[in-house]
């Protein structure tokens, strides 16, 4: 994916996501919707789903920076730092624990505060995009299961991630009525 397409996708989908969330009432933003994958007793709200996107966007940028710096295992999901393979169950347990910690930390924030989290993460992504060469955007990010696995594809996947979480929010809201 080329630089222009990545930036357009990120900006257009971010604007769509902000408009979509802005159309919700405060009650709709804060209502318990989906059970946590880590602790099913804990429920995520629409705002929790929106805040989660900032965590993953920052993590993607950190993985890409590690790759550019020469780290052989920049994603660090499939194998640990010692090169030992992780099972899918181990990977998902680790990911769910990390996202749960983030959700608990940011639960209860206002829409404005959550939008600021996302803006900060997006700024990191756009700065990284501006720092990377066209050749680097086409490099494979070792261990990345997202998009086409390239650096550019992973950056652009942030847009798809937002739409995926919105679908979960929308579906959960429909089930409640």
Model-derived segments and spans:
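A short, structured beta-strand-centered segment in the mid-to-C-terminal lobe
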Residues: 9, 104-120
